[in-house]
Amino acid sequence: TRELIHNFDGAGIIQGIHNTNKSIESFARACFGYAVDTKQDLWFSTKDTISKKYDHTFKDIFQEIYDNEYKAKFEELGIEYFYTLIDDAVARVIRSEGGFIWACKNYDGDVMSDMVATAYGDLSMMTSVLVSPSGVYEYEAAHGTVQRHYYKHLKGEETSTNSIATIY
């Protein structure tokens, strides 16, 4: 399927995002499965009022999988699936005491996890675990890298990055 995104009259730029329904379904099942395993509520947020096709597809797939595959189990466990816009989710998360899983698309999760970790303590106290639908786990540094020091290093400037500083 082809669709015109924008007809430029002059210089400009387009940002494109893609995903497959199969991949979104896999992500949704991993989230719902993790919520069941940990017996925690699952919150999911997008910005489907702006991204009417891409984000709305995520919202619809999550809802369909919840309704058809997980609703009864959630009710049995006394846990809840909750969808809201990401800006509403941010406000709710900041006011909350935690105890739930917040499922986000990749970019949203990357940014929001840093925000939450900083708001409630320190990036060094945060974990980052990627869980595949088949149960494979990948652990990574949650706090990212020191990009500005790397760019200084490339210019031949001295840096003072102290990796031990993140250890408590």
Predicted regions and their residues:
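N-terminal glycine-rich phosphate/adenylate-binding segment common to multiple enzyme folds
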Residues: 1, 13, 107, 111
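Glycine-rich phosphate/diphosphate-binding loop of Rossmann-like nucleotide-binding domains
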Residues: 3-84
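Residues at structural and domain junctions
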Residues: 17, 48, 89, 155-159
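Active-site rim loops that border cofactor/substrate pockets in soluble metabolic enzymes
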Residues: 55-102, 106, 111, 135-137, ...
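Glycine-rich phosphate/nucleotide-binding loop
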Residues: 93-168
